[in-house]
Amino acid sequence: CALPIWTDYCYNLWLARFPGLNKDGAWHNGDSYFHVNIRTLVEVPYLYTRLTGYNYFSDPWYQGNALYVIYQQPPFSKSGGNGSSHQNVLTPSGTRVGYADALARMTGNTYAADYVRRITAKQPDILQQGSTSKAGGLAWFRLQCDKALPDGAGLKDLPMGHVFPQSGLASFSTSLDDTRKSAMLSFRSSPYGSTSHAIANQNAFNTFWNGQSLFYSSGHHTSFTDKHGVYCHRATRAHNSILVNGMGQRIGTEGYGWIPRHYVSDNISYVAGDASNAYGKVISPLWLLRGKQSNLEYSPENGWDDTGLKVFRRHIVTLGKSGYSFIYDELEAEEPVTWSYLLHTVTNPMNVDKTKEYVHIQATSKDGVSDAYLFSAGTLRTDTTSRFFVPAVNWLRADANGYFKPYPNHWHFTATSDKQKVYRFATIIYTHAKDNAENGQTVPRKLKDSSIQIGDWNIKANVSTAGKPSFEVRNTRKG
């Protein structure tokens, strides 16, 4: 009888690949392609649970994955901005909400249940959207599962942030309880590198207000390996990170980052990303073959070469629930190189203003603003453009009428240093409502002791090219 053989094969095939490649519950390939796996993540373990009587959803990965679903894309928010096609994930889809519903019922996770209730209260038909789709539709599961949606602690009871260190993701929101009043920051520095649908955005961050993107990864997923898709969406130049001598991070697992330290609380949170090993020539046999097949050149002219990079550590401190974040970059190379600090927007052009103390870059959306104040040693050469390195041409995706909708341009800011072996950037970002009357009081002030005061926070940071990298953040509010 072949039945035992097939049963053994199917079970072990699922076990080798699922539920995830890690224990923290996140999906390193990004939010868009996470949805491709939803039916497999639910229907297969549900079948095995019914056959054996053992609850396969008791794997701790599923509890972590519920937090990934919530923190990476809070209710009514755009995706955190990782992986191919992330820019198309504007709000939680019906398949995502349906998946959270299944998780809540099968694991008893009340945070996922609250996520579902909040979204369905405003979008009562959302569980019908995509319910029969090939990859994410869970209509068959819902016809069989009679477990109730659990009650208990909800989104207001969660910490303001969560870090997934094995996957290399972090996300912080000032109000998971109410996205309309929430400043969000997402971050990636991943051991998985930029292979498959993951992108070369080690040590990159994105900001949001009311679920709308502000500083955000740019480019379009025109296809998996065409020139725009690789040079302008997958490559580091598309993300809010750093270029070294104009060069970006390797494509492949070799271009990796990691999160060595993190701390989360509602008073102050911290995450450190290390992308020191991410840069250099593309050496992945798989991606070299794909490049050859697609007429791609991983050349210095296109942004890949040896850089002599020794250290790229990015420290991010979220200053409570104030909407302020502080970012400190420690950079070092074997020889003097230029260091380019990148920011991007996909909704509106950026406003840029240079003062003696800092460069002010402002991103806006319909309801929100991110003000970035960039400090460094010496004078930075700045440039802002609305042009991609390679134009985005929609040659692949037509609608039902055969119309190929044009891809819009995005906006790109670059601040480049002179050649230095050691360099530091310090950035204060304030993300807030566009109509915030207190915005005029948020401009950073340089004090006599060279520290920076902004709001109730005092920051000391070594941005010179001498001495050890260091920073200190203190809250100065009394009482």
What are these regions (language model features)?
Residues L15-A16, G20-N22, W27-E43, Y48, ...:
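Long, repeat-rich segments with strong aromatic
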Residues V36-L214, D418-R424, Q441-G479:
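Carbohydrate-active enzyme catalytic cores, enriched for enzymes
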Residues C1-L3:
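Short, small-residue-biased leader/transition segments that mark boundaries at the very start
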Residues W6-L13, G30-T40, S58-A66, A112, ...:
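Secondary-structure capping and boundary motifs in well-ordered enzyme cores
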Residues N82-S93, V97, L214-A235, N240:
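Aromatic/acidic polysaccharide-binding cleft in carbohydrate-active enzymes
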Residues I5-A26, W61-K78:
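Long, well-ordered core segments of solenoidal/helical folds
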Residues G130, H221-G479:
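CBM-like, beta-strand-rich accessory domains located in the C-terminal region of large
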Residues T7-L21, T179-L185, T307, N394-Y407:
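Active-site-adjacent bridging/hinge elements
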